[in-house]
Amino acid sequence: MEIREFADMDKFEDIMNNWAKATGLATVAVGADGKYISGCYNFTDFCIKLTRGSKEGCRRCEKYDREGKGVYHCHAGLIDFGIDLVVEGQKVGSVIGGQVLPEQPDEEKFRKLARELGINEDKYIEALKKVNVRTEEAIDASAMLLGQVLNNFINAEYSKKINCSIIGSLTDGVNAANHLVEEIKKKTGELRGIQSKQKILALNAS
């Protein structure tokens, strides 16, 4: 089951975009296979261009993307989140994001990380200074809210599709039944015609 098969993705994207603007947090949705199914909102250069732009940084990021649940600290020291999207007990994807600092950063710590990842230190620190700072409580509340809203939305969309399918099946069934009734009426009329002819023949024979 894929979200794009039953949900209005324009409305889905609107929810994510508005949430990202309101909170200052980054977010993206992925399908059950881990591939992006939405745009990337509020993604930082620190994460996308630099950390993920390095081979080792990308490897570490992808590991946390797969394994991270709830709100957690990523390998680069930022706070991220991963919330499952579930329809009728089946996981159909996740919404992941965050990319914010829980406090003012220790510059030397990030210079060390830049060296580990093979990233230019000065560019890394320059990008780091543009990363938003949020308390863990605010990040947790924001992430849970987005998860609840998106889960409510996709479940409503799924129910709507199922209901439309049921109505469509019922309509087809009613149409088929009406057609059958018309056929029966037609055959009944033909039988009556034959019976009338037989009566006339019988009377003539007598």
Positions of PLM-derived features:
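Short regulatory/linker helices and ligand/cofactor-binding micro-motifs at input modules
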Residues: 1-6, 129-131, 174
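Structured interaction and signal-relay segments at domain junctions
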Residues: 1-77
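Sensory/regulatory domains in signal-transduction proteins
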Residues: 59-115, 130, 134-141, 145, ...
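Active-site gating loops and adjacent loop-to-helix segments of metal-dependent hydrolytic enzymes
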Residues: 115-121
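Signal-transmission coiled-coil "S-helix"-like helices
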Residues: 122, 126, 133-171, 175
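Residues at a fixed heptad register within alpha-helical coiled-coils and interdomain linker helices
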Residues: 168, 175, 179-182, 189
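Amphipathic helical oligomerization segments
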Residues: 182-206
